[in-house]
Amino acid sequence: MAAGAGARPAPRWVKALGEPLSAAQLRRLEDHRYSAAGESLFEPPLQLFWTWLLQWIPLWIAPNTITLFGLAINLFTTLVLIFYCPTVTEEAPYWTYLLCALGLFIYQSLDAIDGKQARRTNSCSPLGELFDHGCDSLSTVFMAIGASIAVRLGTHPDWLFFCSFVGMFMFYCAHWQTYVSGVLRFGRVDVTEIQVALVIVFLLSTFGGAMMWDYTIPILEIKLKILPVLGVVGGLIFSCSNYFHVILHGGVGKNGSTIAGTSVLSPGLHIGLIIILAIMIYKKSATNVFEKHPCLYTLMFGCVFAKVAQKLVIAHMTKSELYLQDTVFIGPGLLFLDQYFNNFIDEYVVLWIAMVITSFDMMIYFSSLCLQISRHLHLSIFKTSYQQAPEQVHKHID
């Protein structure tokens, strides 16, 4: 059956999740084509490995299954590290860092071949693109936490905060410029290079111990752990200069607007609100909630970021306006109100409540979004069928 020929009736439990997209958005989604440009430094040699790896993947395994399996491994290995280092100041057993290096490498490899599997099985679709970016948004949060733990960055709370949120900001900006230009652009130094660098950091902590990052470099008189932080700062400047060059030079819409015909600056409100709330709550906390519970704090705001990033991706795919109002901000709002009323309830308790609210809100939204799209396009999320939608990919190398 052709995509868009009429959605299958939704089961009652699916209807309870809600349907995030309107009929008009679903119609525009049918016309969406994935468009990417650019090639990073490490991509050509790694393509050889990814192509070799693909031949071992059976045709009956769906691309989204590959993506989800990789994400699950990455999340599990990082959660093990968080268990041993909840304040990002502890030193975990050596094998946990090795596990994280392996988990991140597996995630990177599977994330790279899911699209190849989709083209191989003729199952490319907007659903696969959304699912891939949705998983990436969550993985971005966990990678930042894992890397911070590996170098014991909790001894420098301000740098820890910066490194915890800079990855979210850069991921959002990448899709912000896509929303403006209609093309996902990869720089010479991009996510692949970042992931390789993080694998190296995990391996160094495996064989040298996390305490090695406290070594003071002679002459410079700075700790070794500051070097990767400075690398992050350099990456931020380099990447964001490229992103904002695209954003500020006008979009493909009418009068230089976004692909949806809205202001090119409008998506900045969403990531700006997340970062402003995170900074305010961090700095105004009477109980030092971020310093004492940095992993939980980052995960809570990470869930907020993941949902907002997912909304930005689907706004691009459906050529729709991105609205600021969202229930996912209830979690940070509770922390903000608790501080306003002089911590009427213990901040740690409120942080856990916020974590539960934001994580469920994000997962329900993403699940309902995928289910609605799968019904409308007559696709299976975790099954491969040669009768699925035709390939919807356009890629050109600058």
UniProtKB/Swiss-Prot annotation:
Keywords: Acetylation, Golgi apparatus, Lipid biosynthesis, Lipid metabolism, Magnesium, Manganese, Membrane, Metal-binding, Phospholipid biosynthesis, Phospholipid metabolism, Transferase, Transmembrane, Transmembrane helix. It is found in: Golgi apparatus membrane. It is an enzyme of class 2 (transferase). The chain crosses the membrane at residues 63-83, 94-118, 126-150, 161-179, 191-207, 223-248, 266-281, 294-316, 330-339, 347-376. One of its GO terms (biological process) is phosphatidylcholine biosynthetic process. The modification N-acetylalanine is found at A2. InterPro entries: CDP-OH_P_trans, CDP-OH_PTrfase_TM_dom, CDP_ALCOHOL_P_TRANSF_CS, CHOPT. Signal peptide: none annotated. Catalyzes the final step of de novo phosphatidylcholine (PC) synthesis, i.e. the transfer of choline phosphate from CDP-choline to the free hydroxyl of a diacylglycerol (DAG), producing a PC. It thereby plays a central role in the formation and maintenance of vesicular membranes. Belongs to the CDP-alcohol phosphatidyltransferase class-I family. This is Cholinephosphotransferase 1. It comes from Rattus norvegicus (Rat).
